[in-house]
Amino acid sequence: MEKIHDQNIFFLKELFEDQYFDWIYYKQPITFNFFRSGGGTHLYLIENANRKYVARINYYEPKNAWGVKKQEYDVLKFIEPLKISPKAYYFSNNNSIKQDLTIVEYIEGEILGDISDKHIFDLATDLNKLHKTYQFDRTGDTLPPQDSSPYRCTIYNEFANGEDKKIEKYLSWEDINKIIEPYNRINKKLGDWFNNLRIFDNLTKFCLCHADLKKENILTTDKGIMLIDWECAGSDIPETDIGRLFSGCEFSERQQDIFLKAYYGNIPDEIILQRIIFIKKVLDFFYILEDYIILKRKTWNPDKMLKELLGYEKQMDGRA
């Protein structure tokens, strides 16, 4: 891995020598250092004249084909006037390292930890601003969006079909066998239920959504909340963003109520609430896998994971 980082830093140094960027002060030193990795992206901190930038370079090969760095760059340019995200400075999908990359503003801040009421109000304000400012008559992950009608909420399929969400991928994990059957059983039951809901029928108004709202992508700063990692952004119904937020940040019912009143001005119609809660329900299931295996937020313990899965199934059977 160290060899890859050396290669990427060498590439960045050459890039800044070969090209002139008007946002760089070339009379001052430019330093490049590995920052961290995650989500198929290596991050490198670039420092120059008291300013900082982040180079975001793919390392998971399929991300190049998906075009997520181009989408992120386009979206960040598009929403720059809102001042809720980093500025985008550079994009490349044709280079010597054969990996798509962006260079964006480095935001001084901390990943969202304990969630205060002010954080919730700030999130509601930022998302309301995003959703109301950029509205579309189609969905899709390009700008402008190009998906055909009628609308279908594909959030279950998006997660269930992900390579990293297949439990068989983790057969080498100790005692994984006790997880496989219940995970697949609940997964199928969840898909059969969610994909036959009628509450998503006949929707024709959509908006720009972040589409990956979780604590890791939310920074608290001196100027308020900032949203980072916009690779998944696209046009969808706002309920998808809110459901992702509630699940990804593990909002309590009280915190959900505070957000809904701040975002909508009051508690919204029942059908809107159902869309949000049912989307959250889908994500809650897949986040169990993320917690124990993919992102390792929790220490691997198959018995505890099984207990969470069975508890989830019991709740789902009572609600579905």
Regions found by a protein language model. Give the residues of each.
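A glycine-centered beta->alpha junction motif in the catalytic cores
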Residues: 59-60, 101-114, 132, 161-170, ...
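Conserved N-terminal boundary motif of the eukaryotic protein kinase catalytic domain
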Residues: 25-34
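Activation segment
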Residues: 60, 109, 225, 233-235, ...
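Active-site activation/catalytic loop segments of kinase-like enzymes and analogous catalytic loops
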Residues: 239-268, 281-300, 307-315
